[in-house]
Amino acid sequence: MGYNKSLRYSRHEGTTCVIDNHHLKSLGSVLNDVRRKKDRIREAEYEPILDIADQYMVTEDPFRGPGKNVRITLFKEIRRVHPDTMKLVCNWSGKEFLRETWTRFISEEFPITTDQEIMDLWFEIQLRPMHPNRCYKFTMQYALGAHPDYVAHDVIRQHDPYYVGPNNIERINLSKKGFAFPLTCLQSVYNDNFERFFDDVLWPYFHRPLVYIGTTSAEVEEIMIEVSLLFKIKEFAPDVPLFTGPAY
């Protein structure tokens, strides 16, 4: 086959010289088109799942879910924590909260005055160093599924703990899966017999936490421990509207 001059400009042979920008695309735009196509394919795969998931409501943080938070502060106490060890926060034996230096009980009466429905229970602990200019972190370990007859040790050795959350505040959810808390008059039970309040009312329906606190310091540190229980109360809507009229 001889030389054919027309083949120089044949588009089918790929030798066409394009000099206008209408037929040119930058490499970045080509990559963006590929990325958008992948995104559309991924969205098409997730559409059936999203249709089912849209039927459910969840919260990113269960503590910030629906309901009213009612706090009962059990005690504030100063503890001395030795290096490489962790101390038990409370042993749940009435008012004997392992006091060392001093203990101040905050709540004399139960804050829930009516028979409300308890949706959730949280154990909250706040930690603060007692001496200024101390550079260490608070460590923590806890257990929820301990046997009721298990006697916890007051001091344990640190072994793979984790750091306490931001602002030195940590919350632990004590709810048992599949257990509903009954409507009871918690205020009268709490005021009449505080020592038996936990064993008779709370622990049959919620986990009894064993919480240990330590520090990363190489010296003996004095820390302030504030222990609270946070009850999440269901807020009931009124049976009848408070106002009548066209606007309601």
Swiss-Prot record:
Q: Which UniProt keywords apply?
A: Viral occlusion body
Q: Name one GO molecular function term.
A: structural molecule activity
Entry coiled-coil feature ranges: none
Keyword Protein biosynthesis assigned to the entry: answer is no
Name the InterPro entries on file. Polyhedrin
One Pfam entry name = Polyhedrin
Q: Name one GO cellular component term.
A: viral occlusion body
The record's function comment reads: Component of the virus occlusion bodies, which are large proteinaceous structures, that protect the virus from the outside environment for extended periods until they are ingested by insect larvae.
The similarity annotation says: Belongs to the polyhedrin family.
Q: What is this protein called?
A: Granulin
Question: Source organism lineage?
Answer: Viruses, Viruses incertae sedis, Naldaviricetes, Lefavirales, Baculoviridae
